A protein has these predicted regions:
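Short, conserved turn/kink motifs that form compact alpha/beta structural patches or helix kinks used as
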Residues: 27-116
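Active-site-proximal polar cores
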Residues: 1-28
């Protein structure tokens, strides 16, 4: 199999999540919308890694998606890993939007309206 540069290698969901209060006043997360996209993952550079350590925001990976697909979602769900990541930083690089992600402790069951 031949791998081509900038070929999509990950399928993920962009999650739009809203913080709300339930009937008892407890804080809950509600899924407002989701969008399935494909992207190109890459490791963060050593410079990005050390900068993230200085700010105490440890980045796990970077994924690039086509910029017009990005809807300012703050969470990313990777079905193959069954993991929810938070988008710590986004950066437009030409036609690509680079999303820098950190793993969260958030579980699907904790988000109301989960339907993925």
């Amino acid at each position: 199999m031949i791998a081509y540069p900038n070929s999509a290698n990950i399928s993920l969901f962009l999650l739009r999540v809203k913080t709300d209060a339930d009937d008892l006043g407890n804080q809950v997360l509600r899924l407002v919308g989701s969008k399935e996209v494909v992207g190109v993952t890459s490791s963060i550079t050593s410079k990005e890694f050390y900068q993230s350590k200085e700010t105490k925001v440890l980045l796990d990976f970077k994924v690039s998606i086509q910029a017009f697909l990005y809807d300012k979602s703050k969470y990313v769900y990777v079905p193959n890993e069954d993991t929810i990541y938070i988008v710590e930083r986004s950066y437009q690089n030409g036609m690509w939007m680079e999303l820098y992600c950190s793993e969260t402790q958030l579980k699907k069951e904790e988000i109301e309206g989960w339907n993925l």
